[in-house]
Structure formats: C-alpha cells, structure tokens
UniProtKB/Swiss-Prot annotation:
This is Large ribosomal subunit protein uL22. GO terms for molecular function: rRNA binding; structural constituent of ribosome. Keywords: Ribonucleoprotein, Ribosomal protein, RNA-binding, rRNA-binding. The gene is rplV. InterPro entries: Ribosomal_uL22, Ribosomal_uL22_bac/chlpt-type, Ribosomal_uL22_bac/org-type, Ribosomal_uL22_CS, Ribosomal_uL22_sf. The keyword Transmembrane helix does not apply.
Amino acid sequence: METIARHSQARSSAQKLRLVADLIRGKNIEHALNILTFCNKKASILVKKVLKSAISNAEHNHGSDINNLQVKKILIDEGPTMKRMMPRAKGRSDRILKRTSHITIVVSDSKVKDKKGRG
C-alpha cells in the first residue's frame, strides 16, 4: 500500500534538497533514516521529518509493518520565491531570492522494482 506525506513551502532551495533526496531514493526505511541522521546538511533534517510523517501515516492509516516499508518515490519541487531587497552603495539595491520547496515522499510496503530500458 502506498502512503504519501508532503511538506509545502519548506525554507530551503530545491537544489539543496535534491542532493539529500538522491541519497535515500529506493532505500528501505531503516537505512534511509540512518543516512539522514548522519548526513551533515540542513536539508536532511527537513527530509527526515517528512519521512517520519510518511512512516506514521502508513502505520496509522493502513496498518503497515514498518520493517517492510521502502521509499518508493521522493519528489522535490520548487515552491514560491520570496523576493527581498538588500541596500547597496549609492542608493542602489540588489534583489535577494529566498527560495522554498515542496517535499513529497511516497512509501510503499512492496519491493521497489528496477526500471530497465529496452534496447
């Protein structure tokens, strides 16, 4: 059974979050949590929170066994960008872009199948 957890407008850029997401895609839950615990990035804390939420959703809503869960899909999409101004010399200003992201994690209790190309 597939279970989804989302975090909208996470205060980190999609580029930084995708580095962490690539580490856990397709892994089983125990191994993924272990990777995120020892990953030395702020993005790993955000992804770990969403992953724990997905695990709780699977356990509560579908009665899934935690030991059989795997990260089936993890999507990092760009969210809205907050635009701020930074004063510069001679009355000018520069634009600062504060980027946000949407994190979506799908966990499944079935094995993740490898996609093999044809030809």
